[in-house]
């Protein structure tokens, strides 16, 4: 029996044939990705966290106001959603998913047996169970937002010290959301990548940029010049640090992101649920009214780059996706299926209102 570390290195990953299965899902009127906020609870209070924004779930209740589940009800509820949607890939987010680690220890093997690839996104504030490393189709993504000078302030109590302790002997991916303060010190970007590239527990490093809501003005927001610099400076680092996943095309998508959810391939391909397992998170995983012109989502950027790849002559992947979505929408309509994303049908364009002037008293 190989050790958990060896087993992890042999885990299956999404391949070209899986993308063909995904295409088949779309033609059948089903979205190939599913995201579930499995709990409203989180011991962190991170500035700029979209999940706890007042408009994350639109004009309804906030995430903290929803009723969530635990025990058998959570296990059965998540598995039932996966059976309903039949996705190729499931993301389990929060809140902090590891608050429900007992339930996850039942959910994750069940999803693996169904042939579903699963990613758990965690702060690693709670230790990751060692036996999860033996689940073939499971990936753990640990959020580490900057070097300790920023991360330990923003994401306490999930400090560097606690993360390194809780991932010891595991296999994880690192997900980094870059914010404005991290752009101020020369060498910061490479220092971060070099540190995590050197950790034996880390398989890959993913990068996203902070994505604001429309009308937002916050210290985390990046300027257009910042995005251009990141698109220029980060891709060369992948040649020095092999764990960094940073295609040139993905970096360019940060500079020219999708103009709207209708143009975002990730938004079209994913159905997203909040902690009551019935409220939809729209128009994408960010919820609320995200400023797509400043989108920095790593998955959105990667898919936005991919959809521009030529297939044959002037035909691009985007053309095939649009045609497939049109077919899938009709199939879902005739089968009375409501599992597909809302943005598979035309939506009224959101108008960006100017921010209100606040008068100090």
Question: Language-model segments: which ranges?
Answer:
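Short cysteine clusters
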Residues: 42, 46-49, 264, 284, ...
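Radical SAM enzyme [4Fe-4S]-AdoMet core and its adjacent flexible, acidic
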Residues: 1, 61-62, 114, 137-271, ...
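Secreted/processed peptides and extracellular or luminal domains of membrane proteins
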Residues: 48, 52-55, 270, 298-303
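Flexible mid-to-C-terminal extensions adjoining Fe-S/redox cofactors in radical SAM and related proteins
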Residues: 2-4, 30-32, 276-361
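Short, hydrophobic beta-strand segments that form beta-sheet elements in well-ordered domains
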Residues: 118-123, 270-272, 279-281
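Conserved alpha-helical substructure of the radical SAM core
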Residues: 2-131, 319-326, 361
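A structural signal for short, well-ordered beta-strand segments
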Residues: 34, 38, 140, 174, ...
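Processing junctions and N-termini across compartments
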Residues: 36, 40-43, 258, 286-289
């Amino acid at each position: 029996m190989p050790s958990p570390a060896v087993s992890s290195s042999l885990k299956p990953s999404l391949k070209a044939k899986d993308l063909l299965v995904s295409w088949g899902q779309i033609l059948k009127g089903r979205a190939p990705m599913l995201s579930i906020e499995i709990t409203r609870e989180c011991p962190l209070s991170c500035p700029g966290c979209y999940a706890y924004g007042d408009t994350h779930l639109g004009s309804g209740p906030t995430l903290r106001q929803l009723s969530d589940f635990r025990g058998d009800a959570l296990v059965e509820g998540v598995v039932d959603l996966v059976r309903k949607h039949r996705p190729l890939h499931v993301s389990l987010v929060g809140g902090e998913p590891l608050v429900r680690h007992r339930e996850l220890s039942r959910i994750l093997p069940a999803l693996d047996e169904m042939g579903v690839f699963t990613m758990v996104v965690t702060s690693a504030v709670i230790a990751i169970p060692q036996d999860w490393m033996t689940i073939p189709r499971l990936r753990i993504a640990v959020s580490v937002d900057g070097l300790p000078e920023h991360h330990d302030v923003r994401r306490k109590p999930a400090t560097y010290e606690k993360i390194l302790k809780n991932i010891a002997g595991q296999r994880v991916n690192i997900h980094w959301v870059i914010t404005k303060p991290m752009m101020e010190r020369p060498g910061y970007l490479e220092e971060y990548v070099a540190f995590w590239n050197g950790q034996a527990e880390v398989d890959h490093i993913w990068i996203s940029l902070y994505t604001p809501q429309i009308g937002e003005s916050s210290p985390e927001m990046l300027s257009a010049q910042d995005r251009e610099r990141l698109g220029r400076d980060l891709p060369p680092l992948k040649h020095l640090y092999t764990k960094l996943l940073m295609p040139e095309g993905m970096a360019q998508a940060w500079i020219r992101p999708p103009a709207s959810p209708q143009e975002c391939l990730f938004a079209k391909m994913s159905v997203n649920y909040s902690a009551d397992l019935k409220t939809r998170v729209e128009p994408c995983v960010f919820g609320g009214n995200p400023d797509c012109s400043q989108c920095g989502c790593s998955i959105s950027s990667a898919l936005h780059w991919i959809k521009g790849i030529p297939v044959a002559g002037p035909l691009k992947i985007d053309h095939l996706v649009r045609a497939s979505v049109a077919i899938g929408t009709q199939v879902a309509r005739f089968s009375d299926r409501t599992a597909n994303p809302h943005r598979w049908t035309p939506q009224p364009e959101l108008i960006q209102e100017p921010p209100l002037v606040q008068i100090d008293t």
